Amino acid sequence: HYLHRRQRQMCIRDRISPFRSTAFQPGSDDFITVDSEDLKGKWNVFFFYPADFTYVCPTELEDLADNYNDFQKMGVDIYGISTDSHFCHKAWYDSSEAIGKIQYPLISDNTFSISRSFEVLREEEGRAERGTFVIDPDAVIKVMEITCEGVGRDAEALLQKVKAAQYVRDNPDEVCPAKWKEGEATLAPSLDLVGKI
């Protein structure tokens, strides 16, 4: 019913809710525990995807893997998240050439709690939407993007958004215009600029 009242939706500038879950850590072939405390003091990307052993998802995760070193150079940790189990994540890693490239943890959200707290859970299916969240060192959401099932995401575009978010955090009196790239001019909002752009 359209009059049903919802709780307030998650928004930019919201602090993320505490969480704790098991993840598969590629490379070490080990299962690790990841919780909200691990995020503090650094930049993070939460990359929700619908399911392991699918079609668009491995292309996205491989694209992130291909750009992983660039994210790491910027001090950004990446977490892939789906509602599959950590065992399923490992089986996918062991059997897929594309997924075999990744170095970042794949979090299991098989209780749906993380997907639900980020409001990307498709309750009727028990799967997450394609949701991307850039989280700053204070555990505050700075960028969020949700795309439909058939639309894959671009890691290079995400990298640019993270660079802009980091720049604005470090330079709070400046803003990054459209198509801004690192090293290019920014804007300093003032009355002098009104109507002149």
Feature-to-residue mapping (PLM):
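Short active-site neighborhood of thiol/selenol oxidoreductases, capturing the structured segment around
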Residues: 35-64, 158
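A short beta-strand-turn-helix
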Residues: 20-44
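Short, internal strand/loop/helix patches
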Residues: 79, 90-129
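Single conserved hydrophobic/aromatic residue that forms the stacking wall/gate
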Residues: 1-12
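Thiol-/selenol-based redox modules, centered on thioredoxin-like
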Residues: 128-197
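Short loop/turn microsegments at loop-to-beta-strand junctions
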Residues: 17, 43-45, 129-131
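Conserved helix-turn-beta segment immediately C-terminal to the redox Cys motif
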Residues: 52, 59-81, 96-97
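Short, acidic, Ser/Thr-enriched surface-loop or helix-capping motifs
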Residues: 5, 24-26, 135-136
